[in-house]
From Swiss-Prot:
InterPro entries: Ribosomal_uL15, Ribosomal_uL15/eL18_sf, Ribosomal_uL15_bac-type. One of its GO terms (molecular function) is structural constituent of ribosome. One of its GO terms (biological process) is translation. It comes from Helicobacter pylori (strain HPAG1). This is Large ribosomal subunit protein uL15.
Amino acid sequence: MIMGLENLKPAKGSVKKIKRVGRGQGSGMGKTATRGGKGQTARTGYKAKRGFEGGQQPLQRRLPKIGFRTKDSHIYSINVEKNEAIKNLEEITFSSLRALHHFPLYIEGVKLIGKDAKNLASKIKDERIKTSGQK
């Protein structure tokens, strides 16, 4: 037999039988048409809201809220006592601190804290950097 478009058949098991609902008891999908009993879900046009769990407290309301970021101040604190690299810098700039600490881009200012922070005030060359005790 010559292979041609008229001889092609789909692979066995690849074509599913069409589910015809509501076409009599003999079909096995009559009466309630696979929708279960009575109620809201049996009606036409019903669509459950996203996250609806049938009256149970939804998952997104059971879990705690996380990820709040204040809009007021984005100031990053660095403890000078724990970081010797800052003491060794000749000039303390915003970009040099970012290179050392890799803090996020939304940070608008840096505060140097610790006992030795006031001694570093003369090295600071950027107005976005403050030391402890300074406002």
